[in-house]
């Protein structure tokens, strides 16, 4: 989507290191004098430092997480979830405090709130946002062609078995890894579970045995080949605001098992096996069903993923910018 009348400038906290491997920011990025942990505190306590202190001549500010950047300009914020209201036990004490201060600031200051799912829209209404400030802006998915060279390289790098169940995500309590590990370990005929993701908090390291293997952080450019190679992608999270790995896995032909009753059901759009994330037997049954109907799930998942377009996300976001400036 071309929007020549819009100039985007990124603003980030100070980092010791550059972008992660394989990622180059698509826009120029200006750096604030503080790193992210300090920024979260000073933004939500003192509304400082202002974005305008490092970028001149801006019309509005778009914060891409619930923690709003400090600004005197019209503020648009993307809220992916309000999980801390549903499950405060899944977050650190400090995290809960920062998120609650952030929510109060958004209720007071945000001109527009972009929600990545209808489930998050519902939660924002319940939290006190009036309807005219809310916009549903679903996320898109980026697909990458996987070559034979990619397949061989990734297979060798991670020593991928012929068949495996895959989980992708940060290791944290709401991802429900303990029940997923129990489910796979209880299945005598199940392929091993491979866990790809960064360490988060509060989740004990997976038991490393023949049933479970931890890959650690996997760069984005390696994930498509792993999605493509997996037998089943299992994502039985307890709570998500969207669940981007679900649609990413579908876009690369993986049969998907995910949770019913949360936003991942919405994202899956009828193209996944849905399970009760709190019931290990349900997760087991879901994995078995996905393995037995893999071809059908692949076809439905690929069709569903075609509806998830970043171009649509961009169009809806630009429309929200224009509405915000017209009201300012």
Question: Where do the language-model regions lie?
Answer:
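Carbohydrate transferase catalytic cores enriched for Leloir-type hexosyltransferases
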Residues: 1-328
């Amino acid at each position: 989507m071309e929007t020549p009348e819009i100039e985007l400038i990124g603003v980030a906290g100070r980092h010791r290191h550059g972008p992660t491997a394989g990622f180059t920011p698509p826009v120029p990025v200006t750096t604030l004098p503080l790193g992210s942990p300090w920024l979260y505190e000073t933004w939500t306590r003192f509304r400082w430092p202002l974005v305008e202190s490092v970028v001149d001549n801006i019309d509005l500010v778009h914060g891409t997480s619930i923690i709003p950047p400090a600004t005197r300009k019209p503020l648009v914020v993307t809220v992916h979830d309000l999980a801390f209201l549903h499950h405060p036990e899944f977050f650190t004490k400090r995290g809960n405090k920062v998120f609650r201060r952030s929510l109060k600031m958004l209720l007071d200051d945000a001109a527009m709130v972009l929600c990545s799912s209808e489930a998050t829209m519902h939660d924002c209404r319940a939290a006190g946002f009036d309807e005219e400030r809310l916009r549903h802006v679903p996320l898109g998915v980026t697909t990458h062609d996987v070559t034979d060279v990619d397949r061989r390289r990734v297979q060798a790098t991670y020593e991928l078995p012929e068949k495996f169940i895959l989980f992708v995500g940060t290791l944290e309590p709401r991802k429900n890894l303990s029940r997923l590990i129990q489910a796979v370990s209880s299945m005598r005929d199940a392929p091993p579970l491979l866990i790809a993701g960064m360490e988060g908090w509060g989740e004990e390291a997976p038991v490393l045995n023949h049933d479970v293997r931890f890959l650690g952080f996997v760069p984005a450019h390696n994930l498509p080949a792993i999605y493509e190679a997996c037998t089943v992608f299992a994502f039985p999270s307890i709570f998500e605001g969207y669940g981007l790995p679900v649609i990413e896995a579908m876009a690369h032909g993986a049969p998907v098992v995910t949770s019913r009753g949360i936003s991942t059901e919405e994202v899956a759009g009828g193209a996944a096996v849905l399970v009760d994330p709190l019931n290990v037997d349900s997760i087991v049954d879901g994995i078995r069903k996905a393995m037995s109907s893999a071809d059908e799930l692949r076809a439905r998942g690929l069709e569903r993923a075609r509806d998830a377009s970043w171009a649509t996300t961009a169009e809806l976001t630009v429309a929200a910018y224009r509405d915000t400036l017209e009201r300012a």
